[in-house]
């Protein structure tokens, strides 16, 4: 049995300080594909600092957290106690690796807050791996996924194929109405499903896969370059750049 944790954090950014107000995680038995533990915490020090919390990008979700805490689905606690409970859960379930979607971000959030609140970091003794690497290797590289993005208009602001957890989850579930909750536990749960989908496609637990950050659209256009009337290149290009009157063409992905 190989047991892993999938974590997610929600943060505010105050002068580049990544204060975390919501921590969620699920612990998975990858053999049975079952969740053996899940937790949702609201960080007391940030929650009670109303002015600070209101700077959060998803501050409008405060009523959701109130409802979750009243319904005992989330726990309000201090950062140090949250880290203590997390370490205890990891030990009890023999967690061997931690995963997150865009793990460098969540890893840095834990590092900052554990340093700020002077607590031990439960991630220090475990490998922290990026689910996006699996996704890059087994999902977003496929022509089926790219066609899904074309058909559903799933692009970034720069016109690249989207590879967000929301878009990937829509793809693996064939549910384009799905919207990511942007709360820590809910996001951990869908990211765990994405990870399991990658395992079903052949991904290996514990192996680090390269993250492909830019998913260029394969829009080929004809390109012919002549010098003194002689053709020196005839083919296609996929992207054109213009800088200070000079043209550059990207001919390969």
What are these regions (language model features)?
Residues 105-129:
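Substrate-recognition/cap helix-loop segment adjacent to the acidic, metal-dependent catalytic center
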Residues 94-104, 109, 114, 151-213:
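Acidic, Mg2+-coordinating catalytic module of metal-dependent nucleases/exonucleases
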Residues 220-227:
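Short, ordered, surface-exposed loop/turn motifs in non-cytosolic proteins
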Residues 45-67, 132-188:
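Active-site-proximal helix-loop-helix substrate-binding element of RNase H-like nuclease domains
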Residues 67-73, 117-124, 175-181:
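Short, polar/flexible loop-turn hinges at active-site or ligand-entry regions and domain interfaces
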């Amino acid at each position: 049995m190989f047991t892993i944790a999938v974590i997610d954090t929600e943060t505010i950014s105050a002068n580049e300080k990544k204060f975390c107000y919501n921590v969620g995680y699920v612990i998975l038995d990858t053999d049975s594909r079952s969740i053996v533990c899940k937790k949702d915490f609201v960080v007391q020090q940030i929650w009670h600092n109303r002015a600070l919390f209101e700077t959060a990008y998803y501050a409008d979700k405060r009523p959701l957290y109130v409802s979750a805490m009243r319904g005992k689905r989330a726990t309000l606690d201090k950062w140090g106690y949250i880290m203590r409970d997390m370490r205890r859960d990891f030990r009890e379930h023999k967690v061997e690796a931690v995963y997150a979607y865009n793990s460098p971000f969540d890893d840095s959030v834990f590092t900052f807050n554990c340093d700020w609140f002077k607590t031990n970091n439960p991630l220090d003794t475990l490998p922290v791996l990026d689910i996006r690497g699996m996704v890059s290797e087994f999902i977003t590289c496929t022509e089926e996924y790219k066609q899904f993005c074309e058909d559903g208009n799933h692009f970034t602001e720069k016109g690249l194929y989207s590879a967000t957890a929301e878009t990937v989850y829509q793809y693996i579930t064939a549910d384009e109405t799905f919207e990511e909750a942007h709360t820590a536990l809910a996001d951990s749960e869908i990211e765990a499903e994405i990870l399991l989908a990658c395992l079903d496609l052949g991904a290996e637990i514990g192996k680090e896969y390269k993250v492909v950050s830019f998913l260029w659209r394969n829009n080929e256009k004809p390109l012919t370059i002549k010098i003194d009337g002689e053709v020196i290149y005839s083919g296609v290009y996929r992207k054109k750049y213009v800088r200070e009157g000079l043209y550059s063409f990207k001919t390969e992905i």
